[in-house]
Regions:
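Short glycine/proline- and aromatic-enriched beta-strand/turn motifs that initiate or cap beta-hairpins
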Residues: 17-85, 251, 255-259, 269
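Outer-membrane beta-barrel channels and translocator barrels
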Residues: 21, 73-75, 128-132, 144, ...
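Transmembrane beta-strands of outer-membrane beta-barrel proteins
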Residues: 24-28, 66, 76-80, 121, ...
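Outer-membrane beta-barrel pore domains and translocons
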Residues: 29-35, 83-85, 126, 140-144, ...
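Extracellular/periplasm-exposed beta-strand and loop segments of Gram-negative cell-envelope proteins
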Residues: 36-61, 84-117, 143-164, 193-200, ...
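Transmembrane beta-barrel domains of outer membrane proteins
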Residues: 67-71, 124-126, 173-175, 210-214, ...
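Outer-membrane beta-barrel transmembrane domain signature
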Residues: 143-221, 230-231
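Predominantly the C-terminal beta-signal and adjacent terminal strand-loop region
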Residues: 212-269
């Protein structure tokens, strides 16, 4: 997916100089992730379990994100984001776990897989467009591709829960830039059902603090460090599903304005 997106960006770059876009910012980040919480229960007789039961807190995991933001004039922005997350751990179960009617007895050595890939589209309206300070508000829609699976290492038992769903959220972003062009930012997506959607209770949040600095005099290429908290889950009684997780990320990234880079590239002979 990452290679396909980068190829598409390179193919479309020659046309950017003639486009009405004010900016087209490509961004990539990577770094370690840690699981603070990952609780689950699946099936009418399902057993509640935690991240510790599956050794998910024993390691850091590599994370990455790719985003592309189109700035349409001074006020409007559209962001496309791809955020994969896929981990597998091995554990000796400290208790019996019933997963969708399949019972994994105490002492069973299992491989546990947790997949949560996110494809997100966001719209932002620039409410404040100051020289140093900007504030955007808007909304996001995320398609999530989720899979939770347990499998005995000896091959005797296997169970899984998979789902593709659509989640909406409100979004805001603030950024302050110093005269040196070093900048700090806060970005958040969040929504809760507050128990208003019948037999479903759930929520989602994605909050990031960023410190960035320019890598060239033009200021159209930046490096940044980012701390992110991501979490959410749902209790869906009609489907006998409960999952709630909280994850932390510490990443480094780079972003580049493709429109600006094309405009100042030397003309072809």
């Amino acid at each position: 997916m990452r290679i396909h997106l980068l190829t598409l960006m390179l193919m479309t770059t020659p046309a950017l100089a003639q486009s009405p876009l004010s900016a087209l910012v490509a961004e990539y980040e990577t770094g370690p992730a840690y699981i603070f919480q990952n609780d689950g229960r699946y099936g009418p007789t399902g057993t509640s379990y935690e991240a510790d039961d599956l050794n998910q807190k024993d390691n850091l995991y590599r994370s990455q994100r790719i985003a592309l933001e189109a700035r349409l004039g001074e006020r409007h922005g559209i962001i496309l984001l791809y955020a994969p997350f896929d981990i597998t751990t091995r554990a000796t179960l400290p208790k019996d776990i019933d997963f969708r009617g399949t019972v994994f007895p105490t002492g069973t050595v299992v491989d546990s897989r947790y997949l949560f890939d996110g494809y997100r589209a966001s719209y932002l309206y620039r409410l404040v467009n100051g020289e140093r300070f900007t504030w955007d508000i808007g909304a996001s829609v995320q398609i999530r591709n989720a899979l939770v699976a347990l499998g005995a290492v000896d091959g005797t038992r296997y169970a899984k829960e998979s789902d593709i769903g659509v989640v909406g959220a409100l979004k805001t972003r603030l950024r302050y830039e110093l005269p040196s062009r070093v900048w700090a930012g806060l970005e958040a997506d969040a929504l809760s059902t507050f128990g208003l959607l019948g037999n479903t209770t759930g929520g989602i949040y994605d909050v990031a603090l960023t410190l960035g600095l320019p890598l060239n005099t033009k200021g159209d290429v930046h490096a940044y460090a980012r701390l992110r908290l991501l979490g959410g889950g749902a209790d869906v009684t009609s489907r006998d599903i409960y999952n709630w997780g909280n994850f932390g990320f510490a990443v480094l990234g780079v972003q580049a304005d493709l429109v600006s880079l094309v405009e100042r590239s030397p003309p072809r002979p």
